[in-house]
Amino acid sequence: MKLFIDTANIEEIKEVAQWGILSGVTTNPSLIAKEGRDFKQVIAEITAIVEGPISAEVVSLQAEEMLKEAQDLVAIHPNVVIKVPMTAEGLKAVKGFSEQGIKTNVTLVFSANQALLAARAGASFVSPFVGRLDDIGQEGSELVRQIIEIYDIHGIETEIIAASIRHTQHLTDAALAGAHIATVPYKVLKQSLLHPLTDQGIEKFLKDWEGLVK
């Protein structure tokens, strides 16, 4: 499973990129707004840091407007992927993007049927929202499994991005479910580094070494 970071914060991206684990980045209007910076400039800076798909979301709701809005985004860098909401207009836009050779990420996917429709429209990626499903008492990782099974049965090549990752168990569950990609907030990636036994082990090694060199 590949790892993307879900953020628009340049410093967070730079830090995690140095770990050698990043295959891409996802952003959304909320994350961009949080940074208080020019959208296109942020996307351009991200493409200079990470070599891989960079999802940039359109804010228009009509297919024709989405297609127009995306032109400035795809002009930034070939790795820019247009993020589109899972709606009828979104699917129309995905079809248009696919015909132009522009990659798309269909977001806000909450059912296997939505994932099937998105794939058939030509989506390069679909993003089932694991955490938000858990919030309403459904099992997000089970949706990922269902989508994978459907795609495998029908030979669909659309990649599945497990999104709305809230904690480290979500990341583990996404990997076990077989997601192609998990897009993970900075906080959860940092938490994934940690285990108390690791810290204890390092402390013991250092104490043992200090005792040896005295």
UniProtKB/Swiss-Prot annotation:
Q: Which organism is it from?
A: Alkaliphilus metalliredigens (strain QYMF)
The free-text function statement in the UniProt record for this protein reads: Transaldolase is important for the balance of metabolites in the pentose-phosphate pathway.
Q: Which GO terms describe its biological process?
A: carbohydrate metabolic process; pentose-phosphate shunt
Its annotated pathway? Carbohydrate degradation; pentose phosphate pathway; D-glyceraldehyde 3-phosphate and beta-D-fructose 6-phosphate from D-ribose 5-phosphate and D-xylulose 5-phosphate (non-oxidative stage): step 2/3
Q: Which GO terms describe its molecular function?
A: aldehyde-lyase activity; transaldolase activity
Q: Which Pfam families match?
A: TAL_FSA
Protein name, UniProt field: Probable transaldolase
The family this protein is said to belong to: Belongs to the transaldolase family. Type 3B subfamily.
Predominant location category: cytoplasm
Residues in coiled coil: none
EC primary class = transferase
- Which InterPro entries does the record cross-reference, listed alphabetically? Aldolase_TIM, TAL/FSA, Transaldolase_3B, Transaldolase_3B/F6P_aldolase, Transaldolase_AS, TSA/FSA_arc/bac
Catalysed reaction(s) here are: D-sedoheptulose 7-phosphate + D-glyceraldehyde 3-phosphate = D-erythrose 4-phosphate + beta-D-fructose 6-phosphate
Q: Which residues form the active site?
A: 83
